[in-house]
């Protein structure tokens, strides 16, 4: 099996290396990842500037490709020909932090995986809750990612489905099962912080308290709050079918 691996935290992220080592048990892994951090970069693509790809070495000495574009650029370039073969699976992660609920709209990790769906390749995004904290252990999340990837291939996951996987912190004894979930409700508490530079010109930071979410039963938030791995199947058809029907009853003409 040929696997394309990317992320949004950058090619030298410890989460990516841990995931690569596990996925190599399933097949050949090609890494094409951003050269810098693109967290919350969403599905941006570079259209009005050149993109460059350079070979780098990961911490274990293995080769990888670093791109100066976004996570979606990395996967897009790989699929357009930077890889010399079409992958069977696109995997993105392990993200240094959760991608739950509304996070999927902002997440570069999810966007990299979603780019695989654009060209009809089944994909998986993997995130470790609180993975940004010093000393985070990615081994449990990487092991779960390998198992989920193997199952996705065995079940012939459709090529228009992305599995958004969130793994809670904890040992294998604590994080010992998974739940299939729906997206929950993320609560953001963003605040605009305005400051002045030394020349008196304003600049802004987006700050505020850390976001949380509603741990409702059946949701990704509920699963990880109870030490379960959350597996949420996503696709990019965002059509609200109820309102297709309701809006169709309106009069849409120039009369």
Swiss-Prot record:
Q: Which GO terms describe its molecular function?
A: 3'-nucleotidase activity; 5'-nucleotidase activity; exopolyphosphatase activity; metal ion binding; nucleotide binding
Q: Cofactor(s) for this protein?
A: a divalent metal cation
Keyword field: Cytoplasm, Hydrolase, Metal-binding, Nucleotide-binding
Cellular component, GO annotation: cytoplasm
Cysteines engaged in disulfide bonds, as pairs = none
Residues reported in the UniProt entry to bind a divalent metal cation? 8-9, 39, 95
Does this entry carry the keyword Cell cycle? no
Keyword Cytoplasm appears in the UniProt entry:
yes
Which Pfam family, giving just one, matches this sequence? SurE
Catalyzed chemical reaction(s): a ribonucleoside 5'-phosphate + H2O = a ribonucleoside + phosphate
Look at the named UniProt entry and state the broad enzyme category this protein falls under: hydrolase
Localization annotation: Cytoplasm
Stretch forming the signal peptide: none
Superkingdom per UniProt: Bacteria
The record lists the membrane-crossing segments as: none
- What does the record note about the cofactor? Binds 1 divalent metal cation per subunit.
Q: Which family does it belong to?
A: Belongs to the SurE nucleotidase family.
What does the function comment of this entry state? Nucleotidase that shows phosphatase activity on nucleoside 5'-monophosphates.
What is this protein's record name? 5'-nucleotidase SurE
Organism field: Herpetosiphon aurantiacus (strain ATCC 23779 / DSM 785 / 114-95)
Its ancestry begins with: Bacteria, Bacillati, Chloroflexota, Chloroflexia, Herpetosiphonales
| Gene that this sequence comes from | surE
């Amino acid at each position: 099996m040929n696997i394309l691996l990317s992320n949004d935290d950058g090619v030298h992220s410890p989460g990516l290396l841990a995931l690569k080592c596990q996925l190599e048990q399933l097949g050949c892994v090609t890494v094409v990842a951003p050269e810098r951090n693109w967290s919350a970069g969403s599905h941006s693509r570079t259209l009005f500037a050149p993109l460059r790809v350079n070979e780098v070495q990961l911490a274990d000495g293995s080769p990888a490709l670093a791109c100066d574009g976004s996570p979606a650029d990395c996967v897009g370039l790989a699929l357009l020909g930077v890889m010399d073969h079409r992958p069977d699976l696109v995997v993105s992660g392990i993200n240094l932090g959760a991608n739950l609920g509304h996070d999927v709209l902002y997440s570069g990790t999810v966007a990299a995986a979603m780019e695989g769906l654009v060209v009809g390749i089944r994909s998986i995004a993997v995130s470790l809750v609180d993975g940004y904290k010093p000393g985070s252990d990615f081994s449990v999340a990487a092991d779960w990612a390998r198992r989920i990837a193997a199952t996705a291939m065995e079940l012939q996951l459709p090529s228009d489905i992305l599995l958004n996987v969130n793994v809670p912190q904890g040992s294998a004894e604590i994080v010992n099962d998974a739940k299939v979930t729906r997206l929950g409700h993320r609560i953001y508490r963003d605040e605009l912080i305005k400051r002045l530079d030394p020349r008196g010109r304003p600049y802004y930071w987006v700050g505020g308290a850390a976001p949380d979410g509603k741990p409702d039963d059946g949701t990704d938030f509920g699963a990880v709050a109870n030490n379960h791995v959350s597996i949420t199947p996503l696709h990019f058809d965002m059509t609200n079918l109820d309102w297709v029907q309701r809006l169709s009853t309106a009069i849409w003409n120039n009369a």
